[in-house]
Design a protein with these regions (language model features):
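Acidic donor-binding segment of Leloir-type glycosyltransferases
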Residues: 45-78
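A recurrent flexible, glycine/aromatic-enriched loop bordering the glycosyltransferase active site
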Residues: 161-179
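Short beta-strand-to-loop acidic/aromatic patch adjacent to the donor-nucleotide binding site
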Residues: 102-113
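Short, well-formed alpha-helical segments that are part of the catalytic scaffolds
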Residues: 33-46
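Non-catalytic, C-terminal membrane-associated alpha-helical segments of glycosyltransferases
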Residues: 263-324
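Glycine-rich, basic loop-to-helix element that forms the pyrophosphate-binding segment
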Residues: 79-98
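A short, conserved alpha-helix in the catalytic core of glycosyltransferases
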Residues: 183, 187-188, 193-220
Length: 324
């Protein structure tokens, strides 16, 4: 792992609003998406008000940022190989909390800027956490979250506008998530062997098992409601990066990693539901590659295989951008 220290001469886009709170480090995890990751970093600086020294970029093997000057302004952590979101966000939390005065890490996926979440939100969300009766029990605040509704199935949570600003959820995608130092103090980190697929669900389940709450930011969840549907997600992503259906390799990990999720946090009934749902996925798959990946994932999941499978990895991170 190599680390680049920010240079003093770089001048990234200046913030347009108030400064981000002290004691927060923002971390962007990226793989093969320099343009999208650059957009997220620029938004962190200009919209959320982070100073460059408060921003870390974890490069998962291939990639980086689209602007050398921007790279020189923030802290770059380069992992030697692609460790998936599991290993990437594990490294992100380790980097964020190296400084003992940091109490919160703001974890961002490299494509979360495509979801048009309300900004600035970090200062607002942390202020809302402090107003909670049990603020010290908060482990994470996610931008959009889900609840289990039986046999491992989850539903998107869209809080009522008249309700509280923060609402409990069970699990979430990484998205744009605030994680408290309390989480790593209790020994909870993403499990690198999951590589990709349900590694985020496993992490948040373990946060809750450690006695901490996982909350969703109600305002962000309402703004992201449309992109939590398959059609809305595809529409948000299609112009900038391959949609999920264009990446059949994903199906392998979705099929495989539900097995350890069920074993660790569910029951045998979850596996029955998963097998039935996987059969439906095979029937509805757009091509042979996705069908083969699903069946291969089911076999490896039953056998307990974990880690990266070299046959199932990303090859294209983002679409070419038109010239300025």
């Amino acid at each position: 792992m190599s680390v680049a220290v920010p240079s003093e001469g770089a001048s990234p886009r200046r913030r347009s609003g108030p400064a981000a709170p002290e004691g927060v480090t923002a971390v962007v995890v990226t793989h093969r998406r320099p343009g999208l990751a650059g957009d997220v970093v620029r938004s962190l600086l200009a919209d959320e008000g982070f100073a460059p020294e408060q921003v870390v970029v974890v490069v998962n093997g291939a990639g980086g940022l689209d602007d050398p000057e921007l790279e020189s302004a923030v802290r770059m952590v380069r992992l030697p190989t692609n460790s998936g979101p599991a290993g990437g966000f594990r490294a992100a939390l380790a980097a964020a909390f190296e400084e003992p005065t940091v109490g919160w890490a703001y974890l961002c996926e490299d494509d979360v800027g495509l979801f048009d979440l309300p900004t600035p939100r970090v200062a607002r969300v942390l202020a809302e956490v402090e107003r909670l009766d049990d603020a010290s029990g908060t482990g994470a605040v996610v931008a959009y979250g889900r609840r289990f509704v039986g046999r491992g199935h989850t539903v998107n949570v869209v809080p009522d506008p008249a309700g509280p600003p923060l609402v409990p959820v069970d699990v979430a995608a990484w998205g744009a998530t605030l994680v408290s130092r309390r989480v790593i103090d209790r020994g909870v980190l993403p499990a690198a062997e999951w590589f990709f697929g349900y590694e985020d669900f496993d992490f948040f389940c373990r946060v809750r098992a450690a006695g901490l709450t996982v909350l969703v930011d109600s305002a962000s969840a309402r703004a992201a409601e449309v992109v939590q549907t398959d059609q809305g997600r595809d529409a948000a992503l299609a112009q900038a990066r391959p949609i999920d259906a264009d990446e059949p390799w994903r199906a392998y990990y979705v099929a495989r990693n539900f097995f350890p999720l069920a074993r660790a946090h569910g029951s045998a009934n979850w596996l029955g539901w998963h097998l039935a749902y996987s059969a439906r996925r095979v029937q509805r798959a757009r091509g042979r590659a996705a069908r083969v990946a699903t069946l291969h994932g089911l076999v490896d999941g039953a056998r307990g295989r974990m880690g990266v499978h070299p046959r199932y990895v990303r090859t294209t991170g983002e679409r070419p951008r038109p010239p300025d």
